[in-house]
């Protein structure tokens, strides 16, 4: 039985990983995101592949062929909680580096990164394995 909090953690990790696929969206303002009929459309130029395997970030078309043949996507090797948290933290770090001027906003950058790590750490502490 998968506990509800565990499901929330996995969903959160997936959503954060998907969000990190947007390239410089905050730096470029809202030019890549347009609101239309209460839905969000993402400009093709701002979408990157997901960090875990080869995929199309917009259509979420994941190729099982590439996933199975790619060592970087080895489920048994790269499915541990610390590894997933590290990948998500790195993705946020990269997004923050692109969107913030680190020389002027070093303290803000550090606080946001620390906050993200603490949130995931606290979530994982509450999960029963």
Curated annotation (Swiss-Prot):
The keyword Signal applies. It comes from the Eukaryota. Residues 1-20 form the signal peptide. Keywords: Signal. One of its GO terms (cellular component) is endoplasmic reticulum. This is Putative uncharacterized protein YBR013C. It comes from Saccharomyces cerevisiae (strain ATCC 204508 / S288c).
């Amino acid at each position: 039985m998968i506990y509800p909090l565990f499901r929330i953690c996995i969903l959160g990790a997936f959503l954060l990983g998907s969000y990190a696929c947007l390239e410089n969206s905050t730096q470029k303002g809202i030019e890549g995101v347009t609101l239309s009929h209460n839905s969000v459309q993402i400009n093709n130029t701002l979408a990157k592949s997901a960090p875990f395997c080869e995929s199309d970030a917009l259509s979420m078309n994941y190729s099982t062929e590439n996933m199975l043949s790619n060592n970087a996507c080895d489920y048994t090797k790269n499915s541990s909680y610390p590894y997933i948290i590290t990948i998500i933290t790195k993705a946020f770090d990269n997004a923050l580096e692109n969107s913030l001027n680190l020389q002027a906003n070093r303290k803000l950058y550090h606080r946001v990164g620390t906050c993200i790590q603490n949130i995931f750490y606290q979530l994982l502490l509450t999960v029963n394995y």
